[in-house]
Amino acid sequence: TMNDVLAALSTVEAFVDSGGPILMVIAAVTCVMWTLIFERLWFYKATLRKTINGTITHWNARAEQKSWNAHQIRTAMISRVTEQIRLNLDVIGTLVALCPLFGLLGTVVGMIEVFNVLATSGGADAKSMAGGVKQATIPTMAGMVAAISGVFGSTIVNQIANRESQLLEDQMTMDH
């Protein structure tokens, strides 16, 4: 029902508020990371086979495949397709690595809040200190969860990319 949806949104909003502004950065990085992972999976599923088959057909249509020039053409064709296969994989890896770093930044920001409360209240305001501790731990957890999920996605797309690149190279023989 609508009340359940509103209650869920309220819970998410409370979680985001308790994690501080760094949590929104982690969420944005995670969204970009998973968008790129899904884009790669879509490319591998929908487009890559046509690209590889077209490249192999073009190579096999060549009358001469053994000369040095043919070898250079083959290498260029493989490189062109491999570049398409590996597009954004480095960006995905970088985003995976950034997630826990932003989590640690959230920890630092939260601990600064704890120390500010400690300095102003002399340790008497435990509730405010707990808010700072929460703000310190939630981004760390979110960054780690995002990074762990990203490692799985990144590993899958990298394995597919490596396999498809190797298969392309194996299928473009030089024996005519």
Where do the language-model regions lie?
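Residues that scaffold, gate, or flank divalent-cation-dependent active/transport sites
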Residues: 79
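Cytoplasmic juxtamembrane regions at transmembrane-helix boundaries
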Residues: 160-176
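Cytosolic juxtamembrane regulatory segments of multi-pass membrane proteins
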Residues: 59-69, 173-176
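Hydrophobic alpha-helical transmembrane segments of small proteolipidic membrane proteins, enriched
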Residues: 1-65, 83-165
